[in-house]
Amino acid sequence: MCIRDSTYPDDCVLLVDTYDTLKSGVPHAIEIAKEVLEPMGKKLKGIRLDSGDISYLSKRARAMLDVAGLTYVSISASNSLDEYLIRSLLNQGAQLDSFGVGENLIVSKSSPVFGGVYKLVAIEKNGQIIPKIKISENTEKITNPGYKRVYRLFENETGKAIADLIAFYDEEIDCTKDLTIYHQSDIWKFKTIEANTYTVEELQVPIFEDGKFVYQELSVKEIRDYSMQEKARLWDEIFRLEFPHNYYVDLTKNLLDFKIKMLEEKRK
């Protein structure tokens, strides 16, 4: 442990539950922090709990670190965590600063399979874009035909997102007019948004043009900041763990009508 800590003194997080968390792991972490890192002018970044009663152990470990004057040392938890276990730990008052989520982040346990297909939606012939469609017995695998763009609609009053909207590429959304948006498969589900009560942002941006990379790459921090900013524009109800509010990706009337027309023609 001493070799590792002296080699990587600026980013040292110690796993403390390998043998005995409270009798061995945490005391040795305190020893490393006080006798190895602090004399180097460095600080132990944190400790990690990966087994046992994490809520109880985090409280005891926090107290031990604080008594030793190591209030700056953070405590993280891992061990097959998911959103429900994390919520439970927080509700129990666990003294944790961060969570390491692995296997339950790779695949969504509640929806492990994403229904969909990646198919041709148009061809270019003699300078014209000709829409194409894939037909399937499963509605989620029926493609939306044509060259398209995606918008996000926001309420003017709250600044919150209403829905995303897929439109033909040459369709312009006029915010001074009423706008009716339609469910992609359940065509009786639609919503009309009154004129001058919403704004529109286009979501797609060019990455390559004529074979050239034209996108301005962002740093990890910029990506995180943007994600947090966009998350704040969604309703809190979308993030409920139980019975969350659905956020829809709808179609314009033009696109829906054209899709239905193509389906009817292909099924004749």
Which functions belong to the PLM regions below?
Residues V73, L81-K268:
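Gly/Ser/Thr/Ala-enriched C-terminal appendages of enzymes
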Residues R4-T71, L81-L85, N91, L105-V107, ...:
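Buried, small/hydrophobic-residue-enriched core segments of structured protein domains
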